[in-house]
């Protein structure tokens, strides 16, 4: 779809997703958080910005965190626990990935790290740097969805953030329920939203 001229003008006034992704990647690396190395952010202009793209170095031999969801392998149990520690560490640093899906966290084995596993963030343009409180952190963690080793995910997160496991588990289950309800409503109203052009 061709963007509305007013939308193109408004999008030109704010920084592009490509430029935001580049800036966020540099900041994450400065904080010691792994992300593919940023190489360039390119914007094309013809009066208004007509396009933008972000280039980064590709991580080879990495899998996505969503692959840990249904994995019954004991290595997945440890990797899921380490994922909880990683997300807790991000929140302690004030990093909030507002699109924290299992596809936007890469997982790689690394015996040289204390956890034996390393993680890397992608799809960076929706990351915000802010103070992440308990409730906001658990709501963000719930975006990842349910894992076979959810107890290990929460244990790692609680350990890193020094939270009460019982409170965290209760809040996490509540947030998962809210997300399921929201997703059900969202998918159920899709035909109406399309009809109305929303």
Model-derived regions: residue spans:
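A short, glycine/Asx- and small/polar-enriched loop/turn
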Residues: 48-52, 113-118
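C-lobe/activation-segment region of protein kinase-like
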Residues: 117-196
């Amino acid at each position: 779809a061709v963007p509305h001229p007013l939308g193109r003008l408004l999008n030109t006034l704010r920084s592009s997703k490509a430029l935001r992704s580049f800036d966020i990647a540099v900041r994450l690396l400065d904080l010691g958080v792994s992300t593919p190395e940023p190489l360039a952010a390119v914007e094309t202009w013809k009066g208004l910005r007509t396009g933008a793209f972000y280039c980064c170095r590709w991580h080879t031999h990495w899998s996505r965190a969503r692959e840990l969801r249904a994995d019954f392998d004991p290595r997945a149990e440890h990797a899921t626990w380490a994922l909880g520690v990683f997300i807790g560490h991000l929140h302690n640093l004030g990093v909030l990935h507002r699109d924290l899906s299992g596809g936007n966290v890469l997982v790689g084995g690394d015996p040289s790290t204390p956890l034996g596993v390393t993680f890397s963030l992608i799809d960076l343009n929706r990351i915000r740097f802010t103070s992440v409180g308990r409730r906001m952190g658990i709501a963000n963690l719930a975006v990842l969805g349910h894992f076979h080793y959810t107890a290990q995910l929460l244990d790692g997160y609680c350990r890193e953030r020094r939270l009460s496991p019982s409170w965290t588990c209760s809040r996490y289950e509540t947030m998962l329920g809210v997300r399921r309800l929201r997703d059900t409503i969202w998918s159920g109203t899709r035909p109406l939203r399309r009809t109305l052009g929303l």
